Amino acid sequence: MNNAGILRDKSFAKMPWEDFVTVVNVHLLGSALCAHTVFPIMKVQEYGRIIMTSSSSGLFGNFGQTNYGAAKMGVVGLMNTLKLEGAKYNIHTNAIAPTATTRMTESLFPDDFKDKLDPKYIIPAVIFLASEKAPNGEILQAGAGVIANTYIMETMGKYF
């Protein structure tokens, strides 16, 4: 499981470019580096579980988090490709979008809600994604005692 993070929140118009790049480097390139390091080992042993840490900010957006949201959606793109490249070697790659109070997010949630967002509520989803029965290419949102699948969909489209 790769999980490293920093925040440099500001609206896009006010965000220094350096803050944008720094956050993308930590979240997206850090995740890619972790996966790149273990993937060859997993390929040789024909088994592996990679869990990418994404975020609801990447999946749905959040004001003032263009850098963070872009990086976390980039992690989903990385997962979508690794699930294909690893499938024939029994390497399953999934993403988790946790919602929990941490030192980094402590100020974002009201005090009366923080108990519900204890990181312990993320653990069952992580254990499942690390197990032999893990799916391949799933995005799970986890927090407050709820685990939900999240999907990127394409409709039938309209012909013109």
Residue ranges and their predicted role:
Residues 42, 60, 76, 81-91, ...:
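Active-site-adjacent segment of SDR/Rossmann-fold oxidoreductases
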Residues 37-46:
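A short helix-coil junction within the Rossmann-fold of NAD(P)-dependent oxidoreductases
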Residues 95, 113-160:
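C-terminal helical subdomain
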